[in-house]
């Protein structure tokens, strides 16, 4: 949960600055694009069960790969296409990734431990929200003002999230 939310929280924390800094998309559109990403996240959550049915064991890498694609589009394609497609990928990754992590944690912990697992997931979520900007600030202090540094940082976190997700054992077939 920490890696997922770290990858996600870098988007709303830096999207307006990054996008307006490019000068292609006007500031009047930024809030609408971010709201659209939230709407896409809703659909990601609603479609999670269907995605899980189609991807089966591949579900564990779905969200990390979408974060990677989303931040790659934001960083290297840019413009309207990269911004809209990247935002949609990041929103969908967040929307589908959270129910995956919750269901996986509940499955592994068992029914009796669910009351302790959910607070721990919430703690990881809030810790990521707190630490992501602080880690980015520390990175900026080390390397200086690099264009799209927040997106590069998010790409690194998404790679870590992908590697961590690959460690999740496949579910037994029913």
Where are these regions (language model features)?
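Extracytoplasmic gate region of multi-pass secondary transporters
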Residues: 1-34
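A membrane-interface helix-boundary motif in multi-pass transporters
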Residues: 136-157
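Intracellular juxtamembrane helix-capping segments at the cytosolic ends
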Residues: 96-109
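Structural signature of the two symmetry-related core transmembrane helices
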Residues: 58-73
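Multi-pass alpha-helical transporter architecture, strongest
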Residues: 152-174
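Helical-face signature of the major facilitator-like transporter fold
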Residues: 1, 5, 79-91
